[in-house]
Amino acid sequence: MTWYESGGEGSRTALLLHGLGATAAVWKPVERALQERGSVRWLAADLGGHGGSDWQSFYSVGQLAAQLAELVQQQMIGEFFVVGHSLGAYVGLALASAWFGIQVRGVLGIGPKVSWPAADLQAARELATRPVRWYQTGEEALTRYRRVSGLGTDIAPGEEWLARGSVHAERGWRLAQDPRTFAVAGAPFASLVASATVPVLLARGERDPMVSLRELRMHAPQACDIPGAGHNAHIEDPGAVVGLLEHLVARV
């Protein structure tokens, strides 16, 4: 089962896909901005192994995309655009390959990490083999969630985009993430971009330490910076992200 929520109005739909370790709750600011514009509907989904979506025995970008393709077909969405953050951009590009029989019209990728040094890959693989870790308090779990999801420490604890990042059960608190999802790290970004059959627009927060503008422009010459933003531009400047989506829609 893939957890999702949807809303908004308009003849076109934006499929909002979060990054590794996060949940669909990070899209709340963008959802509000879309609601105010009133031109695009939205559907925000938890990727497999995250939030309220089912855990699987293994994970890959293709497997995550296949689950979302099934959701799109079940919801009879028709033509849609993908807005993906970090890992979500990878999954969006896979969906745009025409391998899944759905009608993606364009992909907006925000802050995808396109270069994976050997040390980063090794760290991700080690995380993927670890058992679920339990915490005594929700605050401890929240601190860990901020780190693994890339949300950082400069977001107030009560903010809605931190919602559903942890789960309370009999043994205490744990992250709402299957550790095995870290196995998706290091997928071939260039191959995914090349496989896309629709327009692709890439962007990053100008302060994002995970990817440079030069790296993005190696894959998409029109890639751009979002001024003043860091890795989580969809939270820091949702209006800019919606503006980029509208620019992409106008190109199609």
Q: At which residue positions do the language-model features occur?
A:
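Alpha/beta-hydrolase fold catalytic core
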Residues: 1-15, 32, 36-41, 75-78, ...
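Active-site loop/oxyanion-hole signature of alpha/beta-hydrolase fold enzymes
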Residues: 2, 31, 38-83, 243
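Active-site glycine-rich loops that stabilize anionic/oxyanionic intermediates
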Residues: 19-22, 86
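Serine-hydrolase catalytic-loop signature spanning alpha/beta hydrolases and amidase-signature enzymes
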Residues: 21-29, 42
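Flexible "cap/lid" loop of the alpha/beta hydrolase fold
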Residues: 94-98, 103-136
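Conserved alpha/beta-hydrolase catalytic His-Asp/Glu region
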Residues: 136-189
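Conserved serine/cysteine hydrolase catalytic core
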Residues: 168-219, 225
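Catalytic histidine-centered segment of alpha/beta-hydrolase-like enzymes
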Residues: 229-242
